[in-house]
């Protein structure tokens, strides 16, 4: 089962929305970043950047909300536009990540 490490910030919320809308079963794992749980050795073994969100799918570990969204879209085939429209989707996804994201 997918493990989803998160807090209540906007970037983990994007991933939570995808998981819910796709109907994927997952285990939510809250990370209290206000208390510094992301800096624990156990968490840094999963994500050396010490940030949420992180998705663990079997032996596959993906961090960064947009990387997770793309991984899940490719894995499930959901929410992906036709190949000739993906460039526009990638452009907007990266713009949100680097242009207006938190």
What is the predicted role of each segment?
Residues 1-102:
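GST-like domain detector, emphasizing the conserved glutathione-binding G-site
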């Amino acid at each position: 089962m997918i493990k989803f490490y998160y807090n209540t910030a906007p970037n983990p919320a994007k991933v939570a929305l995808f998981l819910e809308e796709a109907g994927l079963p997952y285990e939510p794992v809250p990370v209290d970043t206000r208390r510094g749980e992301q800096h624990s050795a156990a968490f840094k073994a999963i994500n050396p950047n010490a940030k949420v969100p992180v998705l663990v799918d079997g032996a596959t570990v993906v961090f960064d909300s947009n990387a997770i969204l793309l991984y899940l879209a490719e894995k499930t085939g959901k929410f992906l536009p036709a190949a000739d429209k993906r460039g526009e989707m990638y452009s907007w996804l990266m713009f949100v990540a680097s242009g207006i994201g938190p």
